[in-house]
Amino acid sequence: SADVAGAVIDGAGLGFDVLKTVLEALGNVKRKIAVGIDNESGKTWTAMNTYFRSGTSDIVLPHKVAHGKALLYNGQKNRGPVATGVVGVIAYSMSDGNTLAVLFSVPYDYNWYSNWWNVRVYKGQKRADQRMYEELYYHRSPFRGDNGWHSRGLGYGLKSRGFMNSSGHAILEIHVTKA
């Protein structure tokens, strides 16, 4: 099946079943995430980078994501007996010259933290880094991973709709569409 992290699939095929398949491929890991981002923006996206605040991925970001396609990606806590989650930001350059950034946060300790996610368009090309992480996590009204759908205008003629569950085995599904 092509429903593996690092693949690009038809956007219409993105859903919970696909993301569960991506998640299960990570095996028995306490904190992990499957990410699916559907490109209905009318633009082509080119991978820039992933910045991990904690955790890692063995997957290379899909390089090109055409309009009508969706990228699949995953992340997991660092291997070994370390008390970390998987927290990071994905950055894609869009064919209009701007950057699509997606934050995901799956904490280790649910007594203190919750799942969070965010999506934003930055003017110009910006690689994901610590500053972008801090802005998306602390200052740009992130959404809680609360098992519900959330929508937001992104500017630049775009809007987003996304869902994240509250589990340590997290799924994050985002659709970026024309406004």
Curated annotation (Swiss-Prot):
Any GO BP annotation: pore complex assembly
Subcellular location: Secreted; Nematocyst; Target cell membrane
Site (Protrudes from one subunit (B) and inserts into the hydrophobic cavity from the adjacent subunit (A)) location in chain: 60
GO terms assigned for molecular function: channel activity; identical protein binding; lipid binding; toxin activity
Residues holding an N-(acyl)-sphingosylphosphocholine 1: 31, 79, 168
Source organism superkingdom: Eukaryota
Temperature section of the record: Stable up to about 53 degrees Celsius.
Outcome following mutation: residue 69 to C: In V8C/K69C; loss of ability to form stable pores after addition of a new disulfide bond
PANTHER family registered for this protein in UniProt: BRYOPORIN
Protein's name according to its UniProt entry: DELTA-actitoxin-Afr1a
Annotated source species: Actinia fragacea (Strawberry anemone)
